[in-house]
Amino acid sequence: MAAVIKTEFWRDIKPIADVFKPDAKPEAYIADAPTDDERYYVPFTETVSSRPLWISPSENRWCDVLMAKGAGLVNRHYHPHEVFAYTISGKWGYLEHDWVATAGDFVYETPGEGHTLVAYEHPDPMRVFFIVKGPLIWLDDNGASNGHFDVHDYLAMCRAHYDKVGLGRAAIDALIR
């Protein structure tokens, strides 16, 4: 375990002068990412919303905070690529697994997994930080594919919502890297 240092010993270290390479975009810094301000959450299903944090069209990838204020459901879907999840608050899981995630839990979803995401009733809203590489393949009740959702669908959905609530699509475009 690292030693506990009680002073900010690094205060005299000078920052790097040229932080970004000429073709690099700046970092995406978002204060209070799991905010309570519901305008930032894009309805994903009737019971679950997504707060976009970072979007990469060239990689078909996005990061978001998925939120449900009560019992919630994300339609059955399949991931051809890995997904990472860190639980901020609340309680959630997949009908197909016997674990239930709560605050502080981490989940790595392997490529090739199909599941049904549910948010359980809990005093705190379900908020989960996800790193998703698309597409999501929508599944019917028997597990057969019946549609897809990729980063371009995500961008269109987010832009439309941000325009509707007065935040503007420029706020979404600023997240593109």
Protein language model regions, located:
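Histidine-centered active-site/metal-ligand motif
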Residues: H77-H79, H115
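Small beta-barrel nucleic-acid-binding modules, principally OB-folds
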Residues: N60-K69, V74-R76
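A short hydrophobic beta-strand segment most commonly corresponding to one strand
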Residues: A85, V107-E109, P123-D141
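Glycine- and acidic-residue-biased ligand/ion/polar-headgroup-sensing regions
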Residues: K69-A71, H79-E96, T102
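Short acidic-glycine-tyrosine-enriched beta hairpin
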Residues: P57-E59, G93-A119
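A short, N-terminal "cap"/entry segment at the start of jelly-roll beta-barrel domains
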Residues: M1-N60, N146-H148, A156, A160-R177
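Conserved hydrophobic/aromatic beta-strand scaffold that supports enzyme active sites
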Residues: S50-P52, C63-V65, F84, F106-Y108, ...
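C-terminal and inter-domain tail/linker signature
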Residues: E109-T110, D153-L155
